[in-house]
Structures are given as structure tokens and as C-alpha cells.
Amino acid sequence: MPKPGNLVEVTNPFISDDLGNTWLGVVVGESNVTLTVHFADDNAIHEYRKATINNPDSNGYIIMNVVS
């Protein structure tokens, strides 16, 4: 499990559903974890989104909607 502050690189985490929505799925392995997801595009526009996993039944899996 990565320690707080460590950079975690996820390869090809994007999932598309039947409706054509794009989602970002990350497995972190435990609950009560806050993730900061860094989005950067080719124009060097950076966006940071925070999401907290605090459901012990979630098995440490988070899915975020990706706005296109």
C-alpha cells in the first residue's frame, strides 16, 4: 500500500460504460483513504480532484466520473 504523499501511477484506468460515459477506476486496497487525482491535458491545464473512500465495504475501490 502506498504511503501518504507517494505518487501512484495508474496505467489505463479509464472505463467506458454502455452509455458512453468515461470513468476512472482506481484500486487503493483499503478504506479511509483520500486520493488526489491529477488530470493534465496537452494544453498543460491541470486539475486536481479529491475523493475520500470511507466505506469499509467498498473494498478500497473508487470510481470517478471523468468530465469530457
Question: Each PLM stretch: what is its role?
Answer:
Residues 1-17:
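Short coil-to-beta transition motif at edge beta-strands of beta-rich domains
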Residues 4, 10, 31, 48-51:
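Intrinsic disorder/low-complexity segments enriched in polar/small residues
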Residues 7-12, 23-25, 39-42:
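A generic structural signal for ordered secondary structure
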Residues 18-30:
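Short beta-strand-centered aromatic/proline hotspots
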Residues 33-36:
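Short aromatic-glycine-enriched beta-strand elements
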Residues 40-68:
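Intrinsically disordered, low-complexity, charged/polar segments
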